[in-house]
Structure formats: structure tokens, C-alpha cells
């Protein structure tokens, strides 16, 4: 089976072609970072309009790169949600229209299921069951995964997601958009400076996250300290260590609770070097394994949507002709793949 994947949930237009026998045949991506940089964040209306401009040329390029004609496709997968409703509708309209015109089945894919399954695009793919840590700009959650569509959300953020906390803290430090990667780069220059940042919600039972208080603590620390480059780097390091330690503590709890010894990390924040190193050390000490996608598949992309959609289309799951976007969509409401 060969599937065209379309990702337009936020500020990246991702198109890919995936074949269940040959693997990933093509992958094209357009990022809107420069478009939104002057605003310090994503402007939904601008994002939607840019998707409209870029999506068709990218589809043509992906099909050309995959040496694939319309007749070679067996289905179309597009991101249905969660995400920005205007951006989602661009991908949904194009995906559904192509499916109708080409007489192909189509399915709307859950964006976070795409991230969760992204490590399966790698040669060293995880086997079920496992615990997944999904960390991005909009989501932070721990999920018990027993199969595709067999998900139990063990914990999630009650306020700011980890990626959102990175971006907002970067803005407090005067770093340009996108702030998360820039803060991590600054933190790499930091030294242990004796800052005692809290590890939120680790002093109580449970697997939920909360990062808004940590952001406020960082803001107060910035205001009380000298405004020089090394001090800012030291504060960035302390903040990053606090976020990573918090995520690691909750991952360890989730693994103990489930009895699983495989951990998947995915989403934009999974590209963070300190997070990867910390979780790798933790899993090594526990005698387990950690899996994550390559850097280009940590952020939003069409490959993960094509792969996820293919799994469901193969199982006979597809949707009617209605164009649907679902900005809020609980992960654990998805049907299982038999």
C-alpha cells in the first residue's frame, strides 16, 4: 500500500509518500518560521494562508520525488487534529478533494498519534508495548501504548506544555523566535551556578505536569540577577535541567507503574540533546531501551502522517467525504487497529 501524507496542523506544511514495502519514498517540508518571527509566535491567519500557497507545489514535488503517479496511490492521509482550525482545514480540504477526484480512500489522522508512531519510521523501531513521552509546543503527556490505537493517557500537562514553557522562557530572556531551540543552545554554554529551580509536581504522586510556575520562577530569577551573557546562559541551563529532570522523574514513575521497559520520546522537544542524554542514561540504568525519531521527524512532518494513516487504511478505516478539522481531540478516544 502507498499513501500520500499531508500535515498542516500549525506552521509547517509537510508532504510525504510512504509505502508499506519500500518505506519512505519522499518527504518535503516548508517551515513558516521566518513568516512568524516578527510576531514572536504563530499567527493563525497567516499560517493558514501560507499553507494555501505552499501545499499544492509541495504535493507535486513529493509525488515527483517518489516517482509516483496518482494511479500508484492507494490512499490519502491528512492531519485532522489537534491544531489550529484554519490550518487543519487547508490540509483537510486538499486531502479530501484529491481523494474524491482520484477516487481514493482517505483518513484524518491524529497529529499526536503521528508523533507517537514517528520512531517507527526508523530502522531500529520500537515494539509494543511501551511508554511514550510526547513533548511539543502544545502537548506534554505520558501514554501507555499497547498497540496502534490502544492508548491510555497516564498523565499530561495541566497548564503550559514543555515546549510552550521553553518558548515563553526564551522570550523572557530576549531570545528570538523560535525560542525553544535558541534557549537550549544558550543553556549549552551555561555553568552550574547554584540555582535551585523547582521540579514541579514531583513531590506528590501522579504523572501530570505543570510548567507555568517554573516559568514564573525563571522570570523572577532573571529579574534578580545581573543582565550579562554568562548569567543568562547559567539561568537557561538551570531552567532546562529543571524541565528535563521533571520529565525524567515522571517517565521513571510511568515505567514502574506499567512494568514496561521501553520508552519512546517524540514531538518537537524530543530533539533536545539534554533530554535525550538524560533519558538514555536513565533507561540504561534500568536495563531498558529508549527510542526517538531522527531530528527531522521530531518536528511536524508529513512522513509521520503518511505512516500513521497507512496503518489505519490497511485496517479498513477511512472516513466519508465530509471535510473535518478537530482542534481538540483526546488521543485515547481513537479506535484500535486490529
Swiss-Prot record:
GO terms for cellular component: cytoplasm. It catalyses: L-threonylcarbamoyladenylate + adenosine(37) in tRNA = N(6)-L-threonylcarbamoyladenosine(37) in tRNA + AMP + H(+). Its EC number is 2.3.1.234. The keyword Acyltransferase applies. It comes from the Bacteria. InterPro entries: ATPase_NBD (IPR043129), Gcp-like_dom (IPR000905), KAE1/TsaD (IPR017861), Peptidase_M22_CS (IPR017860), TsaD (IPR022450). Substrate binds at residues 134-138, 167, 180, 272. It is found in: Cytoplasm. One of its GO terms (molecular function) is iron ion binding. It comes from Shewanella baltica (strain OS155 / ATCC BAA-1091). Belongs to the KAE1 / TsaD family. Pfam families: TsaD (PF00814). Required for the formation of a threonylcarbamoyl group on adenosine at position 37 (t(6)A37) in tRNAs that read codons beginning with adenine. Is involved in the transfer of the threonylcarbamoyl moiety of threonylcarbamoyl-AMP (TC-AMP) to the N6 group of A37, together with TsaE and TsaB. TsaD likely plays a direct catalytic role in this reaction. Fe cation binds at residues 111, 115, 300. Its main location: cytoplasm. The lineage of its organism: Bacteria, Pseudomonadati, Pseudomonadota, Gammaproteobacteria, Alteromonadales. Binds 1 Fe(2+) ion per subunit. This is tRNA N6-adenosine threonylcarbamoyltransferase. CDD domains: ASKHA_NBD_TsaD_bac. Its cofactor is Fe(2+). PANTHER family: TRNA N6-ADENOSINE THREONYLCARBAMOYLTRANSFERASE (PTHR11735), TRNA N6-ADENOSINE THREONYLCARBAMOYLTRANSFERASE, MITOCHONDRIAL (PTHR11735:SF6). One of its GO terms (biological process) is tRNA threonylcarbamoyladenosine modification. Keywords: Acyltransferase, Cytoplasm, Iron, Metal-binding, Transferase, tRNA processing.
Amino acid at each position: 500500500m502507498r499513501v500520500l501524507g499531508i500535515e498542516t496542523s500549525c506552521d509547517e506544511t509537510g508532504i510525504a509518500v510512504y509505502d508499506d514495502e519500500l518505506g519512505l519514498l519522499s518527504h518535503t517540508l516548508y517551515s513558516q518560521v521566518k513568516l512568524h518571527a516578527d510576531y514572536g509566535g504563530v499567527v493563525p491567519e497567516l499560517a493558514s494562508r501560507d499553507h494555501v500557497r505552499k501545499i499544492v507545489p509541495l504535493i507535486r514535488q513529493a509525488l515527483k520525488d517518489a516517482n509516483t503517479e496518482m494511479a500508484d496511490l492507494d490512499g490519502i492521509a491528512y492531519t485532522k487534529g489537534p491544531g489550529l482550525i484554519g490550518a487543519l482545514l487547508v490540509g483537510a480540504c486538499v486531502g479530501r478533494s484529491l481523494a474524491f477526484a482520484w477516487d481514493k480512500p482517505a483518513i484524518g489522522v491524529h497529529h499526536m498519534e503521528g508523533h507517537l508512531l514517528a520512531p517507527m519510521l526508523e530502522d531500529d523501531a520500537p515494539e509494543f508495548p511501551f511508554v511514550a513521552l510526547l513533548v511539543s509546543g502544545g502537548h506534554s503527556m505520558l501514554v501507555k501504548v499497547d498497540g496502534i490505537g490502544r492508548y491510555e493517557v497516564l498523565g499530561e500537562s495541566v497548564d503550559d506544555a514543555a515546549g510552550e514553557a521553553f518558548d515563553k522562557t526564551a522570550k523572557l530572556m530576549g531570545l528570538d523566535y523560535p525560542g525553544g531551540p535558541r534557549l537550549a543552545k544558550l543553556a549549552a554554554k551555561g555553568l552550574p551556578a547554584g540555582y535551585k529551580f523547582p521540579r514541579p509536581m514531583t513531590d506528590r504522586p501522579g504523572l501530570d505536569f505543570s510548567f507555568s510556575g517554573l516559568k514564573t520562577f525563571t522570570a523572577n530569577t532573571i529579574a534578580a540577577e545581573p543582565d550579562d551573557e554568562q548569567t543568562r546562559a547559567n539561568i537557561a541551563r538551570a531552567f532546562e535541567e529543571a524541565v528535563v529532570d521533571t520529565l525524567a522523574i515522571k517517565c521513571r514513575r510511568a515505567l514502574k507503574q506499567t512494568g514496561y521497559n521501553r520508552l519512546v520520546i517524540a514531538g518537537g522537544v524530543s530533539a533536545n540533546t539534554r533530554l535525550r542524554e538524560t533519558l538514555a542514561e536513565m533507561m540504561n540504568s534500568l536495563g531498558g531501551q529508549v527510542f526517538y525519531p531522527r531530528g527531522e521527524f521530531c518536528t511536524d512532518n508529513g512522513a509521520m502522517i503518511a505512516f500513521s494513516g497507512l496503518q489505519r487504511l490497511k485496517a479498513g478505516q477511512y472516513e466519508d467525504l465530509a471535510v473535518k478539522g478537530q482542534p481538540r481531540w483526546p488521543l485515547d478516544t481513537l479506535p484500535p487497529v486490529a
